[in-house]
Regions:
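Sequence/structural segment immediately N-terminal to covalent heme-attachment motifs in c-type
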Residues: 28-32
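Positively biased amphipathic helices and basic secretion/translocation or surface-docking motifs
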Residues: 1-8, 22-23, 33-36, 40, ...
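A short glycine-rich, His/Asp/Glu-containing loop-to-beta-strand
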Residues: 104-140
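Short Cys/His-rich Zn2+-coordinating modules
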Residues: 13-23
């Protein structure tokens, strides 16, 4: 597997520091399961962070800090498998959300050749799996915020490039594109957005609003 497009360094560092949202952390962890280069970057960042913490002088805790810490430890949290490598069709970090078989997911059809499945992540950012048959494409759109797309099976292309398994495309509000699935097998992507997409055309706008895109 030759991965060409990687998450930005800022995203990797936020993940390493535990500062990324659940949806973004899931996308990065899934990419790491497929990419040894980025695993090394994150490992170095985590090691550097540990060294910095070891050099920090201790300070007195505020009143109630211990009780607050216990409350946070008791709070439920999603199990994102960090540092795991992919050993099957579904990368390890995704399995707690969808199981081990993409074919068993309860896909929802939104347009001819396109279906999606929403992942139950917390926070503002939303994570979805998008399944597109060869030749089909998501309607032309721009972005109110940022969108990150990780290819899990197949591939897709747009005016900005070609994306294969393991590749991550980062799209900002200035990016206008129409991703189209490549010939061959179905393209399944993990897409994370921190704001709604802006579709062109009346029908795509209506469909996007109905399905929460």
């Amino acid at each position: 597997m030759s991965i060409v497009h990687h998450p930005g360094e800022e995203l990797l560092l936020a993940y390493a520091a535990g500062a990324a949202s659940e949806a973004v952390s899931l996308l990065v962890a899934t990419h790491l399961a497929l990419c040894s280069d980025c695993r090394a970057v994150v490992a170095d960042a985590e090691a550097a962070g540990g060294s910095l913490l070891a050099d920090v002088a201790p300070v007195a805790l505020e009143q109630g800090a211990y009780r607050s810490l216990l409350a946070r430890l008791d709070a439920p949290a999603a199990e994102i498998v960090r540092g795991a490598r992919s050993t099957g069709d579904v990368p390890a970090p995704l399995r707690p959300y969808v199981g081990g078989d993409f074919a068993r997911i309860g896909w929802r059809r939104i347009a001819p050749g396109i279906a999606y499945f929403s992942l139950p992540t917390k926070g503002k950012a939303r994570a979805r799996l998008i399944r597109t048959v060869p030749g089909a494409g998501v309607a032309t759109h721009t972005h109110r915020g940022e969108e990150w797309t990780l290819v899990l099976t197949g591939g897709y292309s747009d005016a900005n490039g070609n994306y294969r398994v393991g590749d991550v495309q980062s799209a900002t509000p200035d990016i206008r594109h129409k991703p189209v699935a490549d010939p061959g097998s179905a393209c399944i992507n993990l897409a994370v957005t921190d704001a709604p997409l802006v579709f062109e055309g009346l029908l795509p706008k209506i469909v996007g609003k109905i399905f929460g895109f």
